[in-house]
C-alpha cells in the first residue's frame, strides 16, 4: 500500500484529515462515504476539491480521506490541506502553484477561549447605568 499511495495530513480549526492519493478515476471518499454524501453543502465540496481543480488532477486520482473533529467547514478545510500535502508528496513541482493559491499554508486561526467574568471570549456583561 505504501508504494502506490501518496499521503498527507491536513488540519483546520479542530479537525484533522488523513488523505491518501492513488492514480485512478477521480473517486473521492470521505470516511467511507462519497464526498457528495459526506459534505451536504456544495461550498464544502468545492473547498475540498480546490487543489485537484487547480492542478487539473480532478479525474486523475482516487482520494481516500479519514477526517475527524470539528464541524463541516473545518473538516472541508482540513481535507483541502491534506489533499494539497498529498499532491506535493506525489509531485513536488506542484508546490509553487499550490503555494501561490494559499493552499499549502496551514490556517492557524483557532477559537479564542472564554474568559472568566465574561459571557464569551470578548463579550462583556451588559452595563446598566441605573
From Swiss-Prot:
Keyword Ribonucleoprotein: yes
GO annotation, biological process: translation
Gene3D superfamilies in the cross-refs: 3.30.230.10
Source organism, top-level taxon: Bacteria
A cellular-component GO term for this protein: cytosolic small ribosomal subunit
Protein name: Small ribosomal subunit protein uS9
Biological source species: Variovorax paradoxus (strain S110)
MF GO annotations: RNA binding; structural constituent of ribosome
HAMAP family, A to Z: Ribosomal_uS9_B
Gene: rpsI
Sequence similarity: Belongs to the universal ribosomal protein uS9 family.
Swiss-Prot/TrEMBL keywords: Ribonucleoprotein, Ribosomal protein
UniProt key word Ribonucleoprotein: yes
Entry-linked InterPro entries: Ribosomal_Su5_D2-typ_SF (IPR020568), Ribosomal_uS9 (IPR000754), Ribosomal_uS9_bac/plastid (IPR023035), Ribosomal_uS9_CS (IPR020574), Ribsml_uS5_D2-typ_fold_subgr (IPR014721)
Pfam families: Ribosomal_S9
